[in-house]
């Protein structure tokens, strides 16, 4: 892999984007991110939610006797409140969850260390987007090619670059690195836009802004990220 493309790969990794090198290809990388189908927010595969109500795991212990909360870093597995000695379990934090309001269900979850105990049958991976609540996700993926220039980007030169590198898919994207007074400016153009575009502008001084363009998040009204 050439140095310019390698630097682009590292920049994507630094912005929490997964990067892969296609078999038998050295002129491009594949970048992908698991996102919500509805709003585009990153789908947090490392998070878990309550089986009963969907509340996120806040990673706290709770005494099953007095209700005192503890950080998971607590070395003790029993409550330190004087005269209590209750057992620390990982309950759902939603006070209206039936794992707290229904005695039979609460007893069943507590016996397994709480809803969020690693060995509990009620501990499930994230099933809802943390931003909009959607249940659908997908991998948004691009095949990335790097084009570096010290002069104003030229559409004809980019078309020739695309032809030489055999770009042919809507997922193929050219990342443009335009060096101006020793300062790098970034731009991009999808293969699908090459024939209809007559002018290229490189408007991003930060690579993270370019990533936000490729993986936009459309926050629904009345929802705060």
Curated annotation (Swiss-Prot):
What does the cofactor field's note say? Answer: Binds 2 Zn(2+) ions per subunit.
One MF annotation (Gene Ontology) recorded for this entry = type II site-specific deoxyribonuclease activity
Mutagenesis or variant effect for residue 79 to A: 50% of wild-type activity
Q: Where are the zinc fingers (C4-type)?
A: 36-53, 63-84
Q: How is it used?
A: Could be used to screen carcinogenic mutations in a restriction endonuclease-mediated selective PCR (or REMS-PCR) assay. In particular, could be used to detect the vast majority of mutations that occur at codons 12 or 13 of the Ras oncogenes that encode glycine (codons GGN) at those positions.
In terms of temperature, how does the activity behave? Is one of the thermostable restriction enzymes that remain active after 20 to 30 cycles of thermal PCR cycling.
Keyword Disulfide bond attached = no
Record carries keyword Repeat: yes
Q: What are its E.C. numbers?
A: 3.1.21.4
Phenotypic consequence of residue 36 to A: 10% of wild-type activity
Q: Which cofactor is recorded for it?
A: Zn(2+)
Q: Name one GO biological process term.
A: DNA restriction-modification system
Effect after changing residue 66 to A: 50% of wild-type activity
Q: Could you list this entry's UniProt keywords, alphabetically sorted.
A: Endonuclease, Hydrolase, Metal-binding, Nuclease, Repeat, Restriction system, Zinc, Zinc-finger
Enzyme class, UniProt record, top EC level: hydrolase
Effect recorded for residue 84 to A: 50% of wild-type activity
Which reaction equations make up its catalytic activity? Endonucleolytic cleavage of DNA to give specific double-stranded fragments with terminal 5'-phosphates
Recorded domain comment: One of the zinc-binding motifs may participate in protein-DNA interactions and the other might mediate protein-protein interactions.
Quaternary structure, per UniProt, is:
Heterotetramer of two alpha and two beta subunits. The alpha subunit is believed to be responsible for DNA recognition, while the beta subunit is thought to mediate cleavage.
The protein's name is Type II restriction enzyme BslI subunit alpha
Name the source organism.
Bacillus sp. (strain NEB-606)
């Amino acid at each position: 892999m050439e140095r310019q493309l390698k630097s682009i790969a590292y920049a994507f990794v630094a912005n929490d984007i997964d990067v892969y090198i296609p078999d038998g290809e050295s002129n491009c990388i594949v970048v992908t991110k698991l996102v919500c189908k509805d709003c585009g927010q990153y789908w947090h595969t490392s998070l878990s939610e309550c089986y009963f109500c969907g509340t996120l795991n806040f990673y706290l212990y709770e005494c099953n006797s007095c209700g005192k909360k503890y950080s998971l870093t607590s070395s003790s597995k029993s409550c330190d409140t004087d005269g209590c000695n209750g057992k620390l379990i990982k309950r759902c934090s939603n006070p209206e969850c039936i794992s707290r309001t229904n005695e039979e269900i609460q007893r069943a979850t507590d016996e397994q260390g709480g809803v969020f105990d690693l060995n509990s049958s009620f501990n499930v991976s994230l099933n809802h987007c943390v931003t909009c609540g959607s249940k659908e996700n997908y991998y948004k993926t691009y095949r990335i090619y790097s084009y570096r220039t010290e002069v104003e980007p030229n559409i004809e030169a980019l078309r020739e670059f695309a032809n030489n590198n055999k770009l042919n898919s809507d997922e193929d994207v050219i990342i443009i690195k335009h060096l101006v007074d020793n300062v790098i400016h970034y731009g991009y153009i999808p293969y699908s836009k090459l024939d209809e575009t007559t002018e290229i502008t490189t408007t991003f001084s930060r690579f993270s802004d370019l990533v936000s363009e490729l993986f936009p998040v459309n926050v629904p009204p009345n929802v705060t990220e």
